[in-house]
């Protein structure tokens, strides 16, 4: 939180604000995101969380339900739009620590570490709620790291979706 506040950044209220913040961090000479999709034989699975979140922010809940029920194909325009939204963050070299080429090869467990360097290698990380277990030992949540809601688009009437999962 200190790195974020010291740089003059505030928590975005909308997806439009999050994209503006991403661009501002780049313009300020920083790197907005740490993203890692590496996971051995399961490499790529963290991207599903991003795509699901983007699906819920670009499409109606009914469309999301059709998608997970396999009533619309993975290459439907709605799903492609959600993948493209994730691509905005992950496929732009300046947006990601190590550049876009590092996204697939960076292990998801290691990906948040850049937030804890000085100066920070990145300011934000998006991952499941278990990710603090991979933060550096001694990290105090609320002091050394904090969280904010992945905002919805202000220009869409889709509410404030939340993605949950279980095992």
Predicted regions and their residues:
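Periplasmic solute-binding protein
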Residues: 1-11, 19, 37-67, 162-167
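Stable alpha-helical elements in mature extracytoplasmic
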Residues: 3, 14-21, 43, 47-50, ...
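Short helices/loops that flank or line small-molecule/ion binding pockets
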Residues: 3, 20-28, 108-125
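A local structural motif
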Residues: 6-10, 90-107, 120-121, 139-144
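Glycine-centered hinge/linker elements that transmit conformational signals in sensory
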Residues: 22-24, 68-104, 150
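Bilobed periplasmic-binding protein-like "clamshell/Venus-flytrap" ligand-binding domains
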Residues: 27-42, 96-97
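Paired acidic/hydrophobic, glycine-rich loop segments that form the ligand-binding mouth/hinge
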Residues: 34, 123-127, 146
């Amino acid at each position: 939180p200190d790195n974020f506040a010291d740089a003059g950044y505030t928590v975005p209220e909308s997806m439009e604000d999050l994209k503006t913040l991403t661009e501002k961090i780049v313009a300020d000479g920083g790197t907005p995101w740490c993203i890692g999709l590496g996971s051995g034989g399961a490499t790529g699975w963290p991207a599903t969380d991003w795509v699901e979140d983007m699906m819920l922010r670009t499409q109606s809940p009914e469309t999301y339900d059709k998608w997970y029920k396999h009533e619309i194909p993975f290459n439907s325009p709605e799903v492609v739009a959600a993948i493209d939204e994730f691509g905005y963050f992950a496929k732009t070299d300046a947006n990601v620590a190590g550049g876009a080429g590092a996204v697939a090869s960076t292990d998801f467990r290691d990906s948040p570490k850049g937030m804890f360097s000085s100066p920070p290698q990145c300011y934000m990380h998006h991952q499941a709620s278990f990710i603090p277990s991979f933060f550096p030992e001694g990290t105090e949540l609320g002091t050394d790291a904090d969280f904010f809601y992945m905002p919805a688009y202000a220009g869409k009437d889709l509410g404030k979706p939340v993605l949950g999962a279980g095992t």
